[in-house]
Amino acid sequence: RVMDEMKDVVFELIFVDDGSSDATLGIMKDLNEKDSRCRYLSFSRNFGKEAAIYAGLKASEGDYVALMDVDLQDPPTLLPEMYEILQEDGYDNVATKRVTRTGEPRIRSFLSESFYKFVNAISKTEIVDGARDYRLMKRKMVQAVLEMSEYNRFSKGIFGWVGFRTKWLQYDNIERSAGKTKWSMWKLFKYSVEGITGFSVAPLSLA
């Protein structure tokens, strides 16, 4: 539906399979056979969200690149508005953030809010509370992100660090269309530690 609305835009769709154990790879192969605009990358095992983001960005070829989760918690219907903003308003990047956490467990909401408060208190790079990875970027920003050579990447911090002009769009949290999240509390904790160590000098000062 979104692609029909944006008829003047040539799309390429890149799906990244992060070592899934279900039928994801087969579905991606079928999509590729039916529509040459659909491409896919498949990891040999689960390397994590950051590796998937980097691989997808590196494989992209377009002048504009959107990052989006396939669970539809990132509403595709925002894409036309995001694209129009980049055409008219002089921004390099349209990012999104949730203004509610409807459907999310309270303990997870509390820990997420605490993380953002803590990391922003000790970091020179602002990481917006509720920020999603869902965004539309111009090619020059994509190239700058790819040139960041961190081994343990933290994209939410990198997007702010590279310094391009950003427009924020807000939306209410949307529950997953299917399946369950694979983000356990332990994985979230490890990801938070990577974010803190990657974008502040405080942990090094305390060591």
Per-segment meaning from a language model:
Residues 12, 37-39, 165-167:
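Conserved beta-strand segments of alpha/beta enzyme cores
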Residues 30-35:
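Short, conserved SAM-binding/catalytic segment
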Residues 37, 41-45, 49-59, 64, ...:
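Acceptor/aglycone-binding surface of glycosyltransferases and processive sugar-polymer synthases
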Residues 1-4:
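Short, well-formed alpha-helical segments that are part of the catalytic scaffolds
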Residues 7-19, 41-42:
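Short beta-strand/loop segment that forms part of the nucleotide-sugar
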Residues 193-207:
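Alpha-helical bilayer-embedded segments of polytopic membrane proteins, i.e.
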Residues 67-69:
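Ankyrin-repeat intra-repeat helix-capping/turn positions
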Residues 17-25, 72-73:
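A conserved acidic beta->alpha catalytic loop
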